[in-house]
Amino acid sequence: MPARPTPPAVPLALALAAALAAPAPAAAARVKELADVVGVRENALYGYGLVVGLAGTGDSERVLFTQQSVAGMLGRLGIRIDPKDVRSRNVAAVMVTARLPPFARPGTRIDVAVASMGNARSLAGGLLLVTPLSGGDGKVYAVGQGPVQVAGYDAGAGGAELRKNTPTSGRVAGGATVERAVDFALGQAPLVLALRRPDLTTASRVAAAVNAKLGAGTARAVDPAAVELSPPPARKDDAVGFLAEVELLEVEADQRARVVVSERTGTVVAGDGVRLRPVAVAHGGLQVRVQRDPAVSQPAPFGAGRTVEATRDRAAAAEGAGGVVALPAAASVKDLARALDLLGATPRDLVAVLEAIRAAGALDADLEVLE
C-alpha cells in the first residue's frame, strides 16, 4: 500500500487560526436560509447530443456511437450513409445536463452543461445541435442548442501537448428552452418546511417563531427535519404571501458541536461549543493533560452578590522530559492545538490526538474524519 503524502509542516496556530478563533455571538438567520418548502426544488434534466464544428478535435472513428449518431441524424434529414463511412473528427458525442428551476414556465431559458463521452480532445468552438432534455420520468422538459463555451484549451504538435483546465466540457449559456412545466401547485399540497440541517432545537424554534408571528397552531415541529404549516383560514388562498412572511422570520439556529478532521491533509475544523473533558493524552513523545478543578466565587461581606459555583479548566503539554507548557483556563480544542503548537507538533499530530480523545469519551462533540 503506498504511503500517504505527508502534509507540509504548517504551524497549528496558523492552520487553525480561523477555525478555532474565539466564538462569535450566535446570529439569527432567516427561515429561508434554514429550510426549503417541500416540493419547491430543482429537477435534473439530461440528454444525449452532438457537438459539431470542431477543428479536428472531435471523436475519432474508433468511437462507434458517434459514427452511428451522425449517420442517424443524417438519415432523418434524408441522407443515407453507412456509419462506417463517417470519418470526420469535427463531431463529438456529448452528454447534456441542466437544472430545471422550480416554477419554470414554457419559454424560460436555462443554462446547460456539456461533457464529452468519447475521445474528443476539445469542444472549443463547437455548436451543440438540438438536444431534447428529459427528466427522471422520461418526459422532455426542455430542448438545448447553441455554441459551447469552454474555459480551457488543448494544443499539441510533434508529440508535445499543452492543456489548461478541462476543454472536453463546457457550458451553453441560456442554451435550453423550457417546453414543459413541472406539475406542482403551491398551496394544494400540505405546506411543510424541510430543514437543511435537521435539528430538534432548530425545528422547535422555527415553529415557535411562526406561531408567535402568525398565531398559535400555525406551525408544528413534526420531527428534527420538518415543520408542518397550517395557514390561518384568512390566508388559505394566499399561499405565496403566507410563505413569504414565514421565510422572512428570523430564528437562531442550533447545531451539534462538531470537529471535522482530514487525515490526508492534516486539516482540523472545530465548531463553536467544542469542549474537552478532563483527560491525559500521550502521543509518541508528546504528553497532554486536561483537568477540571471546582471553584467558588464568594462575594464580599455584606455585598449584593451571591455565591457562584464554577469550574476551572486547565491544560498542559510536555514532550519527553522537557518542560510543561501551561494554558489559560478553557479546555477546548483551541487550547489543545496551542499546547501542541508550542512543542512544534504538526496538524496530523492533532488529528491523531483528537481521535484518541474521542475514543476515550472525553470529547464533547461529534468527530468526523474525512478520507
Swiss-Prot record:
This is Flagellar P-ring protein. Residues 1-28 form the signal peptide. The basal body constitutes a major portion of the flagellar organelle and consists of four rings (L,P,S, and M) mounted on a central rod. It is found in: Periplasm; Bacterial flagellum basal body. GO terms for molecular function: structural molecule activity. Keywords: Bacterial flagellum, Periplasm, Signal. It comes from the Bacteria. GO terms for cellular component: bacterial-type flagellum basal body, distal rod, P ring; outer membrane-bounded periplasmic space. Belongs to the FlgI family. Assembles around the rod to form the L-ring and probably protects the motor/basal body from shearing forces during rotation. The lineage of its organism: Bacteria, Pseudomonadati, Myxococcota, Myxococcia, Myxococcales. The keyword Signal applies. Disulfide bonds: none annotated. NCBIfam families: PRK05303.1. HAMAP family: FlgI. Its main location: periplasm. One of its GO terms (biological process) is bacterial-type flagellum-dependent cell motility.
